[in-house]
Amino acid sequence: KSVTTLKDEEIGFLKGTMKEKMEPFMYSFMHNFEKVIGKYNVELLRANNMIEEMPIAYMRGINIDNSITIIDEAQNISIDNIRTIMTRLGENSKMIFLGDENQIDMKKKGESSLNFIINKFKDFDEVGTVVLGEDDVVRNPLIKKIEQIFRESKM
């Protein structure tokens, strides 16, 4: 998951283990993951060390084999960093990139990797893309109206 914070809202250095440091950044993903597969199943996967959380900075030099890697908030990962992530793909593995092009928090929006990877890899047989639209919003019906206001305001 990208550890990009919202518009200059730095939180400073965090104490603790890598897992403890990653926890605030992983909270939203894990919360939603629990909704999908259930809290018990997430706890079971954690207990069996089948879930690993890793900052991009620690990925260099590793191969990710026999795994499904989920990269959340991909719109806030730079193209250089997405390259680091993608080139870790090992045997019998898949990568899933999640993101919203309307929620880019990077200072230079053109450096976001989400549209880059969608456009550059769309013709690869090994790559699939799912784009969710306004009709796919399930969080709250009001969200559709909120998104429409922001789209019309070009924010």
What are these regions, as identified by a protein language model?
Residues 1-155:
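Conserved helicase motor core of SF1/SF2 NTP-dependent helicases
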